[in-house]
């Protein structure tokens, strides 16, 4: 199926992508109803997509998917919440068939916001079929728990004290359609934050676990569309269409779009930004389902809202005409925190990633580890700094870190056409260690100055700089490392335009 980017309505464009995905899933489905690569919930969301799009055309695929789900062994990793949600979106699926598939499988209910919200929404969907007052009370208590544990206006934690724009977007998308007014009020506040994160560049998902992945992008697209943020939604949809043109599908990682290898995973350089639980067919079916929902519910644009107040929040967003920078200031894992800001240079759909999200899978072999974090390290490469605390005062972020028992500090100041990064520590070591996206051409003009000619950006330091090209990865793929070697202090100014101060 050919795909052309045209100035048609978002509903039509979303429908076209959903149809593309539906056809691809039909081709990828095996005779037994499963998919080529192991998946957790692809059959359920694929069946929902097919049943809503064209139940007659895809009848054999729908039946095969349901039969596969009936035959599936319910292991401890059985994604009950996701499978149930997909099944409940299939028009006309009888309760007997639903129960035959789910059987007595327990819910996972991890201490993660999106799973908790999904479980609550599933319970709401079951209430429509005549559940009693006890379940309504349980849902009310569950919502109180979710708000207390995960909601910190205007954002949802992923896990307590950890932010992920991907799973924030999923929570907002789920609550947007809730029949409960209290849920929709929270969804509106959460979506306003997504509008700020997305801007006009179309990258809605750059902070925290799952950065860059299609899962968060389609959820953000749905919530933004439903709430009338059409400028932001249009830019996200453009990114999805562009990725589809480049790869012929919707890749799992939209900030590293490429053909799917036979062995995708977190350790494969061809699939950067993946986690051990990521599955191409899960995310493809999930994306198709949300895109079709967008096509089915067109909305009118709304006036720009009042920007969310982030003064006390754990994330920081700095937007100027030259760039947008995003930071997450708390968390427990490498992918939670941003010791170097995620920076987008320029505006609109021509925006370029300068500094991509860093960190990644930690519970399985992966491309990521302590060495891949953009913080100082000892000159021999044996020890790497760890963040102790991050805080923000107006346009300045301070990060306290410890390296081989020695305390140090990074200060990042954001101005209209300049970002200044200063590292200080009471020992000679390798400072900065910033990871510049591989698409950015970087030229060393003097020992203390670098130039990105295509972006009009100059890196000016008061110490010597080195460009290290060897085997570094961000969530967007390979990167060049900028290092101030063997020093105890460095100030780097990243300047847009012709500022020679």
Q: At which residue positions do the language-model features occur?
A:
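Extreme N-terminal leader/anchor segments
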Residues: 2-15, 19, 23
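Aromatic-lined, polymer-binding surfaces characteristic
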Residues: 3, 23-186, 198-201, 208-222
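Type-3 copper protein
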Residues: 188-191
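Short amphipathic alpha-helical segments that mediate assembly, nucleic-acid/protein binding
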Residues: 18, 59-62, 95-98, 233, ...
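Beta-strand-rich recognition/accessory modules
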Residues: 449, 458-501
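Extended polysaccharide-engagement surfaces of secreted carbohydrate-active enzymes
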Residues: 2, 196-469
């Amino acid at each position: 199926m050919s795909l052309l980017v045209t100035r048609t309505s978002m509903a039509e464009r979303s429908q076209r992508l959903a149809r593309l995905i539906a056809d691809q899933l039909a081709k990828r489905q095996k005779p037994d109803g499963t998919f080529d690569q192991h998946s957790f919930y692809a059959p359920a969301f694929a069946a929902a997509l097919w049943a809503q799009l064209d139940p007659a055309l895809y009848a054999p695929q729908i039946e095969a998917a349901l039969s596969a789900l009936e035959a599936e062994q319910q292991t401890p990793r059985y994604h009950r919440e996701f499978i149930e949600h997909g099944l409940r979106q299939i028009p006309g699926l009888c309760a007997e068939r639903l129960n035959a598939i789910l059987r007595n499988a327990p819910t996972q209910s991890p201490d993660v916001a999106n799973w908790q919200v999904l479980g609550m929404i599933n319970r709401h969907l079951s209430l429509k079929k005549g559940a009693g007052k006890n379940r309504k009370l349980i849902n009310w208590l569950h919502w109180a728990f979710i708000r207390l544990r995960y909601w910190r206006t205007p954002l949802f934690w992923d896990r307590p004290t950890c932010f992920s724009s991907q799973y924030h977007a999923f929570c907002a998308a789920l609550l947007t359609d809730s029949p409960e007014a209290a849920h929709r009020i929270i969804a509106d506040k959460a979506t306003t934050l997504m509008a700020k994160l997305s801007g006009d560049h179309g990258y809605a998902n750059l902070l925290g676990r799952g950065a860059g992945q299609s899962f968060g992008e389609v959820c953000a697209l749905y919530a933004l569309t439903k709430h009338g943020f059409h400028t932001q939604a249009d830019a996200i949809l453009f990114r999805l269409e562009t990725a589809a043109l480049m790869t012929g599908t919707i890749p799992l990682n939209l900030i590293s779009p490429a053909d799917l290898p036979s062995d995708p995973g977190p350790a494969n350089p061809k699939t950067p930004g993946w986690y051990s639980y990521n599955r191409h067919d899960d995310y493809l079916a999930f994306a198709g389902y949300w895109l079709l929902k967008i096509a089915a519910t067109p909305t009118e644009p709304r006036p720009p809202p009042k920007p969310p107040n982030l003064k006390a929040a754990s994330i920081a967003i700095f937007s100027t005409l030259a760039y947008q920078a995003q930071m997450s200031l708390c968390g427990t894992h490498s992918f939670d925190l941003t010791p170097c800001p995620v920076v987008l240079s320029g505006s609109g759909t021509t925006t370029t990633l300068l500094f991509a999200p860093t960190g990644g899978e930690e519970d399985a072999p992966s491309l990521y580890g302590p060495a891949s974090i953009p913080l100082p390290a000892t000159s021999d490469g044996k020890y790497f700094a760890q963040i102790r605390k991050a805080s923000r005062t107006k346009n300045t972020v301070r990060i306290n870190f410890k390296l081989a028992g020695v305390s140090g500090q990074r200060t990042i100041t954001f101005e209209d056409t300049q970002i200044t990064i200063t590292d200080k520590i009471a020992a000679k070591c390798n400072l900065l260690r910033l990871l510049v996206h591989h698409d950015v051409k970087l030229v060393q003009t003097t020992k203390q100055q670098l130039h990105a000619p295509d972006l009009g950006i100059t890196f000016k330091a008061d110490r010597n700089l080195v460009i290290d090209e060897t085997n570094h990865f961000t969530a967007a793929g390979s990167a060049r490392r900028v290092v101030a070697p063997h020093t105890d202090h460095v100030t780097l100014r990243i300047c847009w335009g012709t500022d020679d101060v």
